[in-house]
Amino acid sequence: MAFANFRRILRLSTFEKRRSKEYEHVRRDLDPGEVWEVVGELGDGAFGKVYKAKNKETGALAAAKVIETKNEDELEDYMVEIEILATCDHPHIVKLLGAFYWEGKLWIMIEFCPGGAVDATMLELDRGLTEPQIQVICRQMLEALHYLHSKKIIHRDLKAGNVLLTQDGDIKLADFGVSAKNVKTLQKRDSFIGTPYWMAPEVVMCETMKDTPYDYKADIWSLGITLIEMAQIEPPHHELNPMRVLLKIAKSDPPTLSCPSKWSLEFRDFLKTALDKNPETRPSAAQLLEHPFVSKVTSNRALRELVAEAKAEVLEEIEDSRDEAEDDDSSESASLPGKHKRDPSEVSQLSFDGDKPPDSSSLKTTNGPVATEKEMVNGQSDKVLDERISSDSDKLVNSHSTKTLASSGPDEGKATPGKPDIISLSGRRGSSAEGDKQPMPGSKERRSMVDRPESSHLENFPEEKLANGSLDSSAVFPGSRSKGDSDSGSTSASESMDLTISLSADLSLNRESGSISLKDSRMHNKTLKRTRKFVVDGVEVSVTTSKIISEDEKKDEEMRFLRRQELRELRLLQKEEHRNQAQLNSKHQLQLDQMLRRFEQEMTAKKKFYDTELENLERQQKQQIEKMEQDHSLRRREEAKRIRLEQERDHVKFMEQLKQKKKEVKNEVEKLPRQQRKENMKVKMDDFAQRKQTMEQDFLAKQKEDLELAMKNITAQNKKEICDKERECLNKKQQLMRDREACIWDLEERQQQEKHQLIKQQLKDQYFLQRHELLRKHEKEREQMQRYNQRMIEQLKIRQQQEKARLPKIQRSEGKTRMAMYKKSLHIHSSGSAAEQREKIKQFSQQEEKRQKAERLHQQQKHETQMKDMLAQCESNTNELQQLQNEKCHLLIEHETQKLKSLDENHNLHMKEWRDKLRPRKKALEDELNQKKREQEMFFKLSVEADEQTPASPVKHTKFIPFSSTESS
């Protein structure tokens, strides 16, 4: 179900799927086999193999990184690496010679470095680097990092396996498979990616928390860890499982050198400065270039010596120094010393994708006289097997090497700063000599180098007598278990016969510790001597390395291989997690962009709708006003016409009345006597004419006044109607504006809620992916732990079977020796008859049988106890792992809860601020609308007042015919 949800999260729509695209630096039209010829294999990694290739035209060599891809989308995972290699041009960074995509395989052709990787060189030489060599490498790495960081590139996987050596004694940084190319200078990253042992604390924290991203200073931490790795072969905490080292890095103090006294103060100060857990105070590459440890480096001679030594012809010699005192039933033949030459080793060219595991070898070269063929370490080859989960592999603790200059050189006689402590044991037999005493005459000097990177057990180691000439590993390493609890032995310390007590004590001690017999101890006294001769700057240098050959050499290789496999599996998970994270981020960004586009479209549509409504309302208003004005004009004309017609009729009536009055005046005059008629007629008619004119003027004035009043009333009524309509339209318009703003506010609120829900869901998807990836990682860790526990149990079973098979031989050998010594003792102290002696011998034999039976029972009980302890330890390892995983899951869930809570709180705060800002917006809108309403009212009021103050416009009157006296006559 969870996987289905996970697939749903990462599922993209059909139109969202990215089509195959062309990449700038990758050629698709050319078969790389036509240009390059594969001449060998350099290594393999989590994502493919690395081959040595030769250009068919120029003959130039390249490291061909071949990666099989299932589909086109996987190409995107490698484009960052190709782009970085193509754009970087620096003498200490590998160059890209070409990239091809052909038949589902991606070929990345990288500059070939003959010196190989630094970690492979250390394994080849069985020692760490000297301080001068580390100084040169550090200087050149800082220059490369300064260049990368100036290009906004974070390497994110610095380690010795990704530092390649050239033939000229320079280094080149490689493997940008997990590097990040930023867009901004101050951009930070939150991807949990890299190799655990070299991870900076801030990168480790990103496994469960993305709130504390890191920047380019994570490379500075990895640089410091790499320097410790070069000094000690292994990085700090290499004895821990990769899953536990992350917790160690996050919670522990910054790591330091295991033996600080062997290194210069400047080196220690440089590491202290670089390994600062606070990235804010951690210096940059440019600042570290000014540090005294690297500022004075001017020559790369030390690296040229290193490359020449690693590539020199090797003369191997195997010595087999067996004790002369052979057991009677020893049936194994001695191995004869043999010599053979070995071609210069093919050191691994490239740490493919950075998955080289920490190796278990901890050998270092010291300056001293050339070892002779008879030089042997007095003792046994002890390799301490750490049975805890933190164990990395068996440690080879007895080895030594010498370096001799055939001709004097500038560095002759200088002590190596990083040489390990040395235990000097003098004398073939007897007690060890004190450090300031000369060895006994005829004895040979033995040197045993013991170097444990994780702790310095040999510092201030007290000089003590070695009983019977044997050095028990438990005395050298307190608290550590001897190899297999069964592989240490003791050598007879004297050829005298008075050894009953000491021999018995030795044998019982060895049986208690599970050690092997005298004969078996001699099987481990094989010494492999490697002599390398090379010339640097005209100086011939001879380096001889000696180490004890152990049965567990294959076991070391197997442990290294298994650890490499574990890191590869972790790297694959990281890569897949990174890809899934990128896909999810891309999907989330696409969702967010789509949502924002939809929001914008919705907002635009709403605004457009209301703008259209406003336009329609204004247009409708304009049309209505125009129609009203037209109607008013028409009404005015019609009303004026009607009034004029009525006035004309009234005027006609009035004129008729005047005519009638005129007739009445004439009739009155005619009633007068004839002699008075003429004068009276004239007076009466003049008077009537005056009255008629006055009456007509008054009548016309009244008609005019009535007409003007009627027109004025009509105009006022029209204005009132238009004003009402304007008010109505303004109210509608303002209501529409209110609706528009309210809709916009509701839409804003809904969009913010929707955006919050999307971001919240995306955050849940993000943590779901993190939980999914964390559970996958935990499942892989449990699988690795189960394999580890199974290996420990199988090794214990094999060791116990070997002990069980050896015990009868030990008992037979011991029984014969004790019987011979007892008979010799009876012969020396002869008392009693032969029968008594035979009876004593019989009793002694019976006691021996009882003792041997008790030993076998003791061994069985010890094996059962060991198995119980081992099973308990395995269960403890599993429980501890489960507890760590539960803590991580709990931390992730707790962080998710806090993140969701913080997201909700921020959203609520944002909405509160938005609502607080909404009130002023509403008030501003209402103020604006009220202001427009007041302006309109003021406009109408002023218009009315203006109409009242200004005289009425002249009215076009009817063409009244003025009444005149001529007409009346």
Swiss-Prot record:
GO terms for cellular component: cytoplasm; membrane; plasma membrane. It comes from Gallus gallus. Homodimer. Keywords: ATP-binding, Cell cycle, Cell membrane, Coiled coil, Kinase, Membrane, Nucleotide-binding, Phosphoprotein, Serine/threonine-protein kinase, Transferase. May act as a polo kinase kinase by mediating phosphorylation of PLK1. SUPFAM superfamilies: Protein kinase-like (PK-like). ATP binds at residues 42-50, 65. Residues 36-294 form the Protein kinase domain. This is Serine/threonine-protein kinase 10. It is a peripheral membrane protein.
